[in-house]
A protein has these predicted regions:
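An acidic-aromatic
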Residues: 23, 88-142
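Flexible, processing/modification-adjacent segments and terminal tails
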Residues: 47, 117-186, 264
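Amphipathic hydrophobic-ligand
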Residues: 75, 105-106, 207-212
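C-terminal motif of bacterial Sec signal peptides marking the signal peptidase cleavage site
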Residues: 15-18
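N-terminal leader/targeting segments and the immediate start of mature chains
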Residues: 20-76, 271-280
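Bacterial N-terminal signal peptides that target proteins for export
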Residues: 1-8
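Structural recognition of beta-strand segments within beta-rich domains
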Residues: 72-85, 89-98
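Gly/Pro-enriched, hydrophobic low-complexity segments
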Residues: 20-21, 156-268
Length: 280
């Protein structure tokens, strides 16, 4: 149980910094037959609109669920998840009888991990994870809920859709943001019902994704279509990591309590030291 909180940090590092450095390169799409382009553009606009129509607005969410982590050995825990849009993500680990053994809190500028088993905590600037990228709490919230986003632009919407390219073969739609961060690209895929199915992060030198999030159990809610199963895969150092987060029914826009307090009697640990436990 002592590794669960650490692994949560690592998973966030894997997902938030895999796009590489803050330097970006803009990809220009090739030109072609004007008539063909017009037809494709009309189809693409329709698919864009249908995908965007599935994305609602929300202010708060809270739910219970389960978390399974495999990083050489596997462990599972019940969880409580709470979010305030643009402000905070709170995950409480409760493996037995609803007793909290650890928690993770991400705010606009900081990340906190509390390990109640060993009475220690880590408190770091969120820049530890973002490495200079314009990634916000909202970006991570979108990632956890299965909502497509464009780094630096927010959730996909009518105003920013031109900053990505959408292709469709009738069964699968692929959304590729135009701005690529040096060394990596990231793409979203959707099924024919316009539900998100994956987020793939791929190094420029590779033909397959190095980091992948699979989304399933997508449900229509008051906040739009939300994936209730989130499964992330990737490699951290020499270790293969898999994390699966399953949500129960989500309560939206209610009163949510986010505990920002840090236990004064706990010892503070450098988060980089925790990360190094899994880097070899």
């Amino acid at each position: 149980m002592n590794k669960i909180s650490i692994t949560l940090i690592i998973t966030l590092v894997m997902l938030m910094t895999a796009c590489g450095t803050a330097k970006k390169a803009t990809v220009t799409n090739p030109t072609g037959n004007t008539t063909q382009q017009t037809t494709v553009q009309t189809q693409t606009t329709a698919h864009y609109d249908e995908i965007i129509a599935t994305l609602g607005t929300w202010q708060t969410m809270q739910t219970g669920g389960s978390l399974t982590i495999d990083v050489g050995s596997s462990f599972s825990s019940g969880v409580q998840v709470r979010m305030v849009r643009d402000e905070a993500i709170f995950i409480s680990l409760r493996p037995m009888l609803g007793i909290e053994v650890g928690r993770l809190l991400i705010t606009a500028d900081s990340i906190y991990v509390i390990d109640k088993v060993h009475k220690r905590y880590a408190a770091e600037k969120v820049s530890l994870l973002t490495a200079g990228l314009p990634i916000t709490v909202s970006t991570v919230q979108d990632m956890f809920l299965g909502r497509p986003f464009i780094i630096g632009q927010g959730t996909l919407n009518q105003a920013n859709k031109e900053k990505a390219t959408l292709t469709n073969d009738g069964a699968v739609s692929v959304l590729t943001p135009n701005d690529k961060y040096k060394g990596y690209s990231y793409v979203f895929t959707f099924n024919k019902s316009h539900n998100i199915t994956s987020l793939n992060i791929t190094p420029a030198s590779a033909s397959t994704s190095a980091y992948q999030v699979r989304y399933s159990n997508v449900k229509k809610t008051t906040a739009g279509n939300i994936a209730h199963t989130f499964r992330a895969n990737g490699t951290v150092g020499k270790k293969r990591l898999t994390l699966e987060l399953n949500y129960n029914n989500i309560e939206w826009n209610g009163s949510v309590k986010i505990d920002h307090s840090l236990p004064s009697s706990y010892s503070r640990v450098n988060a980089n030291q925790l990360l190094n436990l899994f880097s070899n």
